[in-house]
Amino acid sequence: RRDLAVLAKGRRVLDVCTYTGGFALHAAAGGAASVTGVDLDEKAIATAKRNAKLNQVKARFVQADGFHYLRQLSNQDERPEVLILDPPKFARDRNEKEEGMRRYRDLNRLGLEALAEDGLLLTCSCSGVVSEDDLLDALRNAAARANREVTVFRFSGPAPDHPMALHAPETRYLKALWARVRKL
């Protein structure tokens, strides 16, 4: 989140699936030109607003479905220059993986279409059954469908307080891809 604050400085930031505003608040504290956080959960949005007030940062929080919000945004002139996609777990187990991957592909496609030219994307997954390679495949598919050139410049994972058990690779459930995005 601290790294995001540096990248967000002076830019318009959209945090989709913001939950309680963690990424959005760091972007605002880092000097983003504007910050909007979107989440479907009414209580999470109320908490995000309280967190912004407690941290004395300016951020706008909207209760909305992230997929729908991104669809509407793709028709707007002023698009985010930095986009964070940090959805809840789309696949809880192997039986849900195919549907979860479809949702990751769709969310990333909508995000890429909504992002400003030469934008930055941080896309995340907290699904243990979705590997880093799976997330890369979803982003690759989304980029092709959105007609975007996506250059991943960083892979990141869990902090030391989220250890991985060697016998259970799904315990390495947090993963994130950082990318630059251009229209083809």
For the regions a protein language model found, what residue spans apply to each?
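C-terminal catalytic and target-recognition region of SAM-dependent MTase-like enzymes
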Residues: 106, 120-184
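Helix-to-beta-strand junctions that scaffold the AdoMet/dcAdoMet cofactor pocket
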Residues: 115-117
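Class I SAM-dependent methyltransferase "Motif I" SAM/SAH-binding loop
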Residues: 17-21, 126
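S-adenosyl-L-methionine
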Residues: 43-84
